[in-house]
């Protein structure tokens, strides 16, 4: 196995589970610091220990000579036959995923040209509907600060001096906002082990 082929395949494997911009910014140490909200990757690694060494192998063993075949092996395993589907009118990523017992995230991993579940499909395109079976576990740890809304409650007051079908808004409700600082781990594109809440601060009170 050529080391350049291996390095390229590992790179393609990684980009199946993380946006290229996020990966590049982490590797180049050019992530933007969080000022109000946002996220940064704190650590990135493989669960497995990968050893590269010279040696002799049997002529009956599989030898990966190009990036594509090795990437396919790393993503789908040794015995997975690649299955394709031809996009028809009305198809969406969600509908194709559901029909083939995939979740949309697995579809996106198998078809990295599509960036989100809302990406438009072109009629006649061949898409990969093979269930992934990764041979490696790509892990990264994230610190994220985000704002979540606190919905206000509607309060109804009755006025006996008004008609029964009369209504008016006396005080407009205001949605509150809580700023949450959290840590979590992502393995092969899936958040694992729950979320650790570092802090939770109300920055805007709700008004019912």
Please place each PLM-identified region on the residue numbering.
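Primarily a LysM-type cell-wall glycan-binding module
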Residues: 1-4, 70-101
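Cell-surface/extracellular proteins and modules involved
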Residues: 5-27, 92-106, 115-117
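Extracellular LysM carbohydrate-binding repeats and other cell-envelope/extracellular binding modules
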Residues: 26-77, 103-138
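Short, recurring structural edge motifs at helix starts
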Residues: 82-85, 94, 115, 166-172
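Serine/threonine-rich low-complexity intrinsically disordered regions
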Residues: 142-208
